[in-house]
Structure formats: structure tokens, C-alpha cells
UniProtKB/Swiss-Prot annotation:
This is TLC domain-containing protein 4. The modification N6-acetyllysine is found at K165. Residues 44-246 form the TLC domain. PROSITE patterns: TLC. The chain crosses the membrane at residues 7-27, 53-73, 90-110, 124-144, 173-193, 211-231. It is a multi-pass membrane protein. It is found in: Membrane.
């Protein structure tokens, strides 16, 4: 077994146990310290709360690390299809450990946080990352896809606000909702164009052919599955954002009428 393979397996295992520790111990202690409302939540709410705390931690780690790699790791950018061992592989190993950890938690607490779409998302991602790490290919693409995680903290924060019963149209929720919509669109929807554009640009080239049919199909299918879910979530998020903006406009119009200043 090569040292690089041992390193990636070690990173995946450390990632798994770290996120398990965060879920079962650290999140309970930390959440009770920073949010007094946490202790008043039901058992089911606490389970999902802890799951989302872990999700946020993972997203910040792999998202920021992934952005650094995308911008500055020349080894990864030099050969997007067949680039050798790089920081991108480490980032993918961290993400893999998290996905395995989260899958185990979802299955264990299925009646509380079970969601078939998350199972599909995690399985599709894990399969793709397994091929990347096993075959040493497409690390650049895998890392690029991880940039989508930068939207998760905003999605989770929205849930935290709701769990703590913040007013639906409070300033904090409105600002977070707008940021969530914008960031989600940039990293999960707008990013599709350069991704599939790159896929088209390398189609039929010698490096692409060397990938083999299995990896070629897996690359396309796993990305399409994930992107279909991203589009579905984007539609749902957009509807919520439009509803909030419409409410704000109605409130402004109402206030203008009350003040005798109809614009």
C-alpha cells in the first residue's frame, strides 16, 4: 500500500471520528453555551440541531479549504483529469469521512432526521469520491464540486433561527435568507456552466479516453443526480426568498399608506 493511500485512509478515518465526536459530545456542550434556547428544545430537535452543527463545521472546513485549493494549488490545476496526489485528495478524504459519519447518524436516527434525498445525495457523492481516491483521477473536479458546501452554513442557520422561534420576517432571517439564496445559486447552480463546459471541452481527448467508460459514466451520472437535486432545492429556496421580498414590499407599502406617503 502506498504512503499516499495510507494517508488518505487515515484522513478519512480521522474525519469520521472527529465528526462523530462533534455530533455526540461537542455540539451538546457548545450549543448550550452559545444558545440558551438549545436546552429547551425537544430531543428530536436537539438531534437535528447537532446534525446541522456538524454539517456547518464540515462545510466551512472543506468549503474554505476547497476554495484555497481551487485558487492556489497549481498541482491540481496543472492536470485536472490525471493530476497526481495533491491537497484536493486530502479535502475529498475529509468530505468522505463526514459523509460516512452523517450517513450513520441519519440511519441511526431515521425517524428523526431520515431523508431519502440526503441518502441519495450522500451515496452519489461517496461513490464519486471513492472513484477519485481509488483511481487517482478527477481530483480537480471533486474539489470543485466541494465548493457547493459553502452554501450549507446559510441553509443550516435558517433552520437554527426557525428552531429558536425567531420571527419569520425578522431582520436576521431576512438577511440570512437573501445570502443563502445568492450563495446557493453561485456555488450550486451557476457553477454548473463551467463544470459541464469543461466536461465538454475534454470529451474525446486522450486523457479523457484513458479514464475508461466506468469513470466517464460515473462522472456524468453522479454529477447529474446531484445537480438535479440542487435545482430542486434552488426552486424551493427561491420561492421562499420571493415570498419574503414580497412581504417586505407589502409592509413598506402599508407603512407608506399609513403615513400618507403612497409612492
Amino acid at each position: 500500500m502506498e504512503i499516499n493511500t495510507k494517508l488518505l485512509i487515515s484522513v478519512t478515518c480521522i474525519s469520521f471520528f472527529t465528526f462523530q465526536l462533534l455530533f455526540y459530545f461537542v455540539s451538546y456542550w457548545f450549543s448550550a453555551k452559545v444558545s440558551p434556547g438549545f436546552n429547551s428544545l425537544s430531543f428530536k430537535k436537539k438531534i437535528e440541531w447537532n446534525s446541522r452543527v456538524v454539517s456547518t463545521c464540515h462545510s466551512l472546513v472543506v468549503g474554505i479549504f476547497g476554495l484555497y485549493i481551487f485558487l492556489f494549488d497549481e498541482a491540481t490545476k496543472a492536470d485536472p483529469l490525471w493530476g497526481g496526489p495533491s491537497l484536493a485528495n486530502v479535502n475529498i478524504a475529509i468530505a468522505s469521512g463526514y459523509l460516512i459519519s452523517d450517513l450513520s447518524i441519519i440511519i441511526l436516527y431515521w425517524k428523526v432526521i431520515g431523508d431519502k434525498f440526503f441518502i441519495m445525495h450522500h451515496c452519489a457523492s461517496l461513490y464519486a469520491y471513492y472513484l477519485v481516491l481509488k483511481n487517482g483521477v478527477l481530483a480537480y473536479i471533486g474539489n470543485f464540486r466541494l465548493l457547493a458546501e459553502l452554501s450549507s452554513p446559510f441553509v443550516n442557520q435558517r433552520w437554527f433561527f426557525e428552531a429558536l422561534k425567531y420571527p419569520k420576517f425578522s431582520k436576521a432571517i431576512v438577511i440570512n435568507g437573501i445570502l443563502m439564496t445568492v450563495v446557493f445559486f453561485i456555488v450550486r447552480i451557476a457553477s454548473m456552466l463551467p463544470h459541464y463546459g469543461f466536461m465538454y471541452s475534454v470529451y474525446g481527448t486522450e486523457p479523457y479516453i484513458r479514464l475508461g467508460v466506468l469513470i466517464q459514466l460515473s462522472w456524468v451520472i453522479s454529477c447529474v443526480v446531484l445537480d438535479v437535486m440542487n435545482v430542486m432545492w434552488m426552486i424551493k429556496i427561491s420561492k421562499g426568498c420571493i415570498k419574503v421580498i414580497s412581504h417586505i414590499r407589502q409592509e413598506k407599502a402599508k407603512n407608506s399608506l399609513q403615513n400618507g406617503k403612497l409612492d
